[in-house]
Amino acid sequence: MILDVRTAGEFNTGHIVGSKNIPLDSIGSNLSELKNLNVPIITCCASGMRSGVAARQLSSVGITAVNGGSWYSVKLATDQECK
């Protein structure tokens, strides 16, 4: 699962197709939900900083998570390109 940890406003300006948005400051209150998904999580954000924090936070509670870094650099299709 691709987890975009930018703000809702940033996410709404464009995001990786199929990604889920939970802003970094809301990760803590969503840990149980994310752990129950039982899937590996790739975090992303605008620069890679917030996604790194989120990946460490998820990993600390036993969730398989890696920092995918800046979603801009992945060059995957975004919702803006698919419309």
Annotate each PLM feature.
Residues 44:
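Short, surface-exposed ligand- or partner-binding patches at beta-edge/loop junctions that are enriched
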Residues 8-40, 49-83:
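Rhodanese-like catalytic fold shared by cysteine-dependent sulfurtransferases
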Residues 1-6:
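Short hydrophobic beta-strand that contains or immediately precedes a catalytic carboxylate
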